[in-house]
From Swiss-Prot:
GO terms for molecular function: electron transfer activity; heme binding; iron ion binding. The keyword Transmembrane does not apply. GO terms for cellular component: plasma membrane-derived thylakoid lumen. The keyword ATP-binding does not apply. Monomer. Functions as an electron carrier between membrane-bound cytochrome b6-f and photosystem I in oxygenic photosynthesis. Binds 1 heme c group covalently per subunit. This is Cytochrome c6. Belongs to the cytochrome c family. PetJ subfamily. Residues 1-26 form the signal peptide. Keywords: Electron transport, Heme, Iron, Metal-binding, Photosynthesis, Signal, Thylakoid, Transport. Gene3D superfamilies: Cytochrome c-like domain. Heme c binds at residues 39, 42-43, 83.
Amino acid sequence: MKKIFSLVLLGIALFTFAFSSPALAADVANGAKIFSANCASCHAGGKNLVQAQKTLKKEDLEKFGMYSAEAIIAQVTNGKNAMPAFKGRLKPDQIEDVAAYVLGQADKSWK
């Protein structure tokens, strides 16, 4: 009986782990510092000084298919159009931190 109970418990734990949404082990506070030093000159307050219609506000991120950590990480890493790539300047974990910060701020309307 104990063996069956242990197996059931293990199965539940594995199922929960396998189907839980993948969370970034990101440091939002560090992301805020990195954003301030590297991104705020063009994106202060979630705005976009180069392409005004493509802000970092939640509705614009959703509209342009950028409302996910993966999309933001790809954009910051590789750059696009006027936005430079940060691949050589920031480490992958720093870019993850920035993505977590941007998504958190977007959820709070950058307030």
